[in-house]
Amino acid sequence: YPAYVLFPQCSESGYWAYAERPSVFQSKKMLADFPISPIFAVLKELLDSYLALPQVDKSRIYIIGLSMGAMGVYDLTVRYPEIFAAAIPICGIVNPKRLKAAKDVKFRIFHGSEDNIVPPSGSRRAYKALKKAGAEVQYIEFPGVGHTSWHQAFNVPDFMKWLFFQKKE
């Protein structure tokens, strides 16, 4: 699959979607309205510089993240739904009240049923909220798998095929 890939890594002292690490990972207790974090503001500038390149297909912009990165996936798709054709949050969490804004982004959500760091109930609620908003969304839960469900997610046979099939309408 030919593509331009941005693969940012958050610093040890930073946190993607929030100015600081949330004190609790319960979807209903996650913030619903907050300013963009400084680290995400810089990342958005970098993304915009790539989007300005004529060779980048603006109808095929995808975002994938795991754990804290999945929280970032939710945050950026809510803030900038016009950019993304598809999103894959893996073992993430979000306040479901935020997701209506991302209804035009196609989602494939992954989580392990035994995740004791970020509870799968957050992904289940995100799935239900996106479905209710009219989004095209799939939820795949891996039975018996803990927080490292990205191993199983990346090994789903049609992972890349599904992603690269998505196009912004």
Per-range role (PLM):
Residues 48-103:
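Primarily recognizes the serine-hydrolase "nucleophile elbow" in alpha/beta-hydrolase
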Residues 1-40:
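Active-site machinery of serine-nucleophile hydrolases
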Residues 11, 67, 113:
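Residue-level signal for short, function-critical loop segments
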